[in-house]
Amino acid sequence: MQIESVEIRKVKVGEIPALVKMAQKAFLQAFTEGNKPENVSFYMNDAFTEKQFQKEFESDGSQFFAAILDGKIIGYTKINEVPSQTDIHDPESLEVARLYVLEDYLGMGLGKTLLDLAISQAKEKGKKYLWLGVWEKNARAIRFYEKNGLKIFGSHPFPFGDEVQTDYLMKIEF
């Protein structure tokens, strides 16, 4: 697969069911290892449902962008402005709330393409920085974000089933 054959664009409302299926699969690929199965199930049944995605899709300040290959969603990012941000709540910032690529397509530059899109959205909107939260045990993602210029600037608790995990907060300033 060549990255040039992947279309990157805003998600359309009719694509939410396909996006949810892809998001569930990518989440399981990324977070099954190292987590209790019941916590993974609990979180997925709360955060990765069509109803929840529809609510987020309609929310002021949230946008979804998808990476599409041969009509199939293989990656996506969700960006948030105030009032939809999960933390920070700084009108001069843009949050990358989610960035996932299916395992079969990792290492092809799609994550960077989606992150670059989020950065360009932040700049176009006149934001001073872009930030995100990443699980402290997700070494691959942390390396990816560091390689792309983000730096850890703090942490916050992340409720996950019956435990509270720690997410590093990372940002890049413009």
Regions found by a protein language model. Give the residues of each.
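Conserved acetyl-CoA-binding loop-helix of GNAT-fold acetyltransferases
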Residues: 107-120, 143-147
